[in-house]
Amino acid sequence: DDDVIGTAFYLMEFKDGRVLWDAAMEDSDKDEAFGVYKSMNDSMAKLHLVNPSEIGLEDFGKPGNYVGRQVSRWSKQYVDSETENIDSMNCLIDWLPKNLPSEKRTGIVHGDYSLTNVMIGKNDPNVIAILDWELSTLGDPCADFNYHCLQYIMNPKLADKDYCRNQGIPVIDEYVKMYSEKINVDLTEEWDLYSAYNLFKLAGILQGILGRVRDGTAAHENAAERASGVRNLS
């Protein structure tokens, strides 16, 4: 309501907690590491089970075909920002629209759910706040959860199941099962499709950064180094 202070605004509740930066939880004991991951899983499932229309968010985004629209968006960004020809990216641009996962339901998706975007209690491992909602919209909750799980691919320690077990972190199969049971959806059949889409999306994001480096508009001085790896992701 612009009339309150003359412009758009929002209210944010203060939370007294911690933001942890190491997804491998190397500075935590096994109990805390497991508790943090369990609470992240619980919080994401609770978000995805919210019915948007019951809280006045039925117009928060376009319903349906979320992954298809995202594939189109990131394909365009990749092409517009292309700095080299990558055959595997070209193949994905052609293949993904023909092999989209089935969207079982529409819910509120965060868009960038990760350990660094949640706040943990000061004296316990529970998620007390979810941060950074600028990518949130209506979409496919399963795609949102799969994007969150890319950490198990991108982080070498989390990709090591023995490391996870020794550290108290659920391995990827256990973590997916925990979530699936909460939302009552079997993710195993289309998990690889979601992973292909999300890795493509991440490659598109990184290519966009490389495009800004090419055009001289990148904000970060190390942008080119940070955005390397498009070919490996594809």
Residue spans of the language-model regions?
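Short, mixed-charge aromatic SLiMs
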Residues: 69-70, 167-176, 221-234
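Helical subdomain adjoining the active site within ATP-dependent kinase catalytic cores
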Residues: 186-189, 204-234
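Glycine-rich "substrate-gating" loop/helix at the edge of Rossmann-like oxidoreductase active sites
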Residues: 31-33, 133-137, 166
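Catalytic activation segment of kinase domains across protein kinase-like and atypical kinase folds
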Residues: 119-148, 154
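Catalytic-loop of the protein kinase fold
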Residues: 108-110, 115
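ATP-binding pocket architecture of kinase catalytic cores
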Residues: 1-108, 121-126
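Active-site activation/catalytic loop segments of kinase-like enzymes and analogous catalytic loops
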Residues: 143-183, 197-216
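All-alpha amphipathic helical-bundle segments outside canonical DNA-binding/catalytic cores
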Residues: 61-62, 186-197
